[in-house]
């Protein structure tokens, strides 16, 4: 299957933009009997499928790669520069956008009397549920959204309960390294996930997804979780990290993770928490 991955830096930028905008009043039309939705955000596409609304989707972005059948939908382009012409050609009633899409493009969509919802990553883990509810409201799947949220909360609670009985492991979750060191700092939802999974986030004192090499070396965590770099495999990224100064001085175990699952807030966030728990648990 063709895979569309975001660069670590692009993932970080996407997480910094923390916006949950309501449906735009401009260009709104009455709720149609048949919705046609274009999703410009991967986690939104995943959520629509999880809520059983896949039949409403008529278009997606290049990065909407899960579930696999989503890739059969027409793509309107990238997250940050979708084609207005392509969007309009699909005759959608609703466009659900990420915060990357230029305001002028969304304004043009609204001028075509198409409803626009701009939605992006949330600052807290709890915000994941808000995102699911927002999408459920748009596609009239409110009860399905609440059911999904209930199932996710049960899974999260089970993981937290188990993690609470186990020793903590010091963890550093990295999205980039080298000239720019990016990590899950204390002001991020991934910090919450590390803590829920039984880890002690050594980058808790950092902000805005950035951390210093000096502090990382000083903290010397037990486990480093590393997102694969653009165009590189998990193994290649880990090898580069381990052989690059000053990271090569660290004694930590280094493990990779699938950023598509872990960094996308949506229906797979409980699964992502289980992944983080399992990675941490292997170091106890």
Residue ranges and their predicted role:
Residues 41, 99-100, 121, 206-208, ...:
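Short secondary-structure boundary segments
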């Amino acid at each position: 299957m063709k895979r569309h991955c975001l660069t670590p830096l692009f993932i970080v930028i996407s997480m910094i933009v923390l916006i949950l905008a309501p449906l735009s009043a401009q260009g709104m039309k009455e709720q149609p009997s048949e919705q046609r939705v274009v999703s410009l955000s991967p986690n939104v596409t995943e959520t629509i499928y999880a809520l059983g609304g896949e039949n409403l989707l008529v278009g997606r972005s290049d990065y909407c790669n899960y579930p696999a059948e989503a890739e059969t939908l027409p793509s309107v382009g990238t997250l940050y520069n979708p084609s207005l012409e392509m969007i309009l050609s699909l005759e959608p009633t609703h466009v659900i956008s990420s915060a990357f899409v230029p305001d002028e493009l969304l304004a043009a969509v609204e001028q075509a009397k198409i409803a626009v919802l701009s939605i992006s990553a949330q600052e807290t883990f709890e915000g994941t549920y808000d995102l699911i509810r927002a999408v459920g409201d748009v596609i009239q799947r409110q009860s399905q959204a609440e059911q999904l949220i209930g199932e996710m909360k049960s899974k999260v609670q089970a993981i937290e309960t188990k993690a609470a009985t186990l020793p903590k492991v010091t963890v550093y979750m990295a999205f980039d390294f080298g000239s720019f060191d990016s990590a899950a700092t204390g002001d991020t939802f991934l910090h919450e996930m590390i803590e829920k999974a039984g880890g002690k986030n050594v980058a808790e004192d950092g902000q805005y997804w950035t951390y210093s090499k000096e502090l990382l070396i000083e903290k010397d965590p037990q486990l480093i979780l590393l997102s694969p770099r653009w165009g590189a495999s998990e193994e290649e990224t880990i090898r580069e990290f381990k052989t690059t100064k000053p990271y090569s001085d660290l004694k930590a175990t280094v493990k990779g993770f699938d950023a598509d699952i872990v960094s996308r807030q949506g229906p797979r966030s409980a699964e992502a928490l289980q992944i983080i728990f399992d990675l941490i648990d292997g170091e106890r």
